[in-house]
């Protein structure tokens, strides 16, 4: 299969100036945050920049709701006007600001303290603010959270590293409730699946499908889980070894650690599993058929692609140089059709030239 360049199928390309650390698509808004603290918003339809601010970096997480953007930035939590980028309020947190989620006017944030002397995290805090930035409650614990998702009861669910590992459930007016998971392996990543399920990836390569009553672990694999996404009841995990594993039973293996996974346009009918890998020198983005893992499309890129963010018809990719590429389903289909036609024309020309050389006795 021919490997195309990422640029050749992108609807537009924009820049942040330093490594992209987070992406979000919300309606016609595409937001990107950088290592150095730039946060920018573009129109998905036109590509026009709507606003751009500079604050302390990195921008670690973003949440959008009710005309606002909430950003975990360096050691702060910011609330911004989604139309202008103006900062409405800012609150300092303890340590690094890691995650933010919003539900029905409640703003949840998580921060962590890293001690250089021992090269480990020593304390984390979950913060609960109202929409005006007033602190309502906070909870402290020893582990860093590697997943921070909204629970259907209005609280949050955290996936923990060592020492306790497992899950931590936090609700307003209650103490934090710890839930061990089978294997007791540190959580490395998580995602929210369908029907209230949480997908939790571990350092031993397992994926746990978690509901209120049960957790169903997959088998161990040779390397940690680095990325997870889902489609319906199926889940897909990306591993440090380069494997992309499906709960449907297939495995795709290629050189380079998997950096990110997302559902996105396939270039034909339906959607595919987008996975970015980095081999230390270049990135390869592979689009896989969800049913059987067959390769639909391969894209090459010279920088590390750490972040993928998608909606039904669009997918955004952010790289280590700060470039953001938006790929739209309709443009991708047209572009791939054009590439195929150009390739066919080139092959026909080559065949014709070969016939002429034979006729001339060359």
Sequence positions of predicted segments:
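A short helix->beta-strand "capping" segment at the edge of beta-propeller domains
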Residues: 1-18, 45-48
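Beta-strand-rich domains and repeat architectures in extracellular enzymes and scaffolds
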Residues: 11-38, 53-61
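Repeated scaffold domains used in trafficking and secretory/extracellular systems
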Residues: 17-24, 57-65, 93-104, 141-153, ...
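Residue position within the beta-strands of beta-propeller blades
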Residues: 32, 71, 109-110, 158-159, ...
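WD40 beta-propeller blade core
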Residues: 40, 78-79, 127, 166-169, ...
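Short loop/turn segments that connect beta-strands within beta-propeller blades
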Residues: 43-47, 81-85, 129-134, 170-174, ...
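Short, solvent-exposed loop/turn segments at conserved positions within beta-propeller repeat blades
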Residues: 72, 116-123, 161-164, 278-283
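Blade-level signature of beta-propeller repeat domains, shared across WD40, Kelch, NHL, RCC1
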Residues: 301-362
């Amino acid at each position: 299969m021919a490997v195309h360049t990422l640029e050749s199928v992108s609807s537009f390309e924009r820049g942040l100036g330093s490594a992209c650390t987070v992406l979000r698509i919300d309606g016609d808004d595409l937001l990107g945050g950088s290592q150095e603290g730039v946060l920018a918003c573009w129109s998905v339809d036109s590509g026009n920049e709507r606003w751009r601010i500079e604050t302390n970096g990195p921008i670690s997480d973003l949440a959008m709701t009710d005309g606002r953007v909430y950003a975990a930035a360096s050691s702060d939590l910011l609330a911004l006007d989604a139309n202008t980028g103006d900062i409405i309020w800012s609150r300092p947190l303890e340590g690094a600001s890691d995650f933010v989620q919003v539900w029905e006017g409640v703003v949840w944030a998580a921060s962590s303290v890293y001690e250089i002397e021992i090269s480990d995290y020593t304390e984390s805090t979950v913060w609960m603010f109202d929409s005006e930035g007033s602190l309502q409650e906070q909870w402290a614990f020893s582990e860093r959270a590697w997943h921070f998702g909204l629970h259907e009861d209005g609280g949050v669910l955290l996936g923990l590293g060592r020492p306790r590992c497992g899950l931590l459930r936090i609700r307003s007016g209650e103490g934090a409730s710890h839930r061990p998971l089978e294997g007791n392996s540190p959580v490395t990543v998580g995602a929210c699946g369908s029907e209230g399920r949480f997908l939790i990836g571990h350092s031993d390569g397992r994926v746990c499908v978690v509901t209120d009553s049960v957790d169903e672990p997959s088998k161990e694999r040779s390397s940690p889980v680095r990325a997870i996404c889902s489609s319906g009841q199926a889940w897909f995990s990306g591993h440090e070894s380069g494997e992309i594993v499906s709960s449907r039973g297939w495995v795709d293996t290629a050189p380079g650690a998997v950096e990110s996974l997302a559902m996105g346009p396939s270039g034909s009918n339906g959607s595919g599993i987008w996975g970015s890998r980095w081999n230390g020198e270049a990135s390869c983005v592979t689009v896989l058929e969800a049913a059987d893992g067959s390769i639909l499309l391969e894209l090459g890129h010279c920088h590390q692609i750490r972040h993928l963010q998608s909606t039904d018809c669009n997918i955004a990719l952010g790289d280590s140089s700060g470039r953001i590429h938006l790929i739209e389903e309709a443009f991708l289909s047209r572009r791939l059709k054009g590439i195929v036609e150009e390739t066919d024309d080139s092959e026909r020309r080559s065949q014709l030239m070969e016939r002429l050389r034979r006729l001339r006795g060359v």
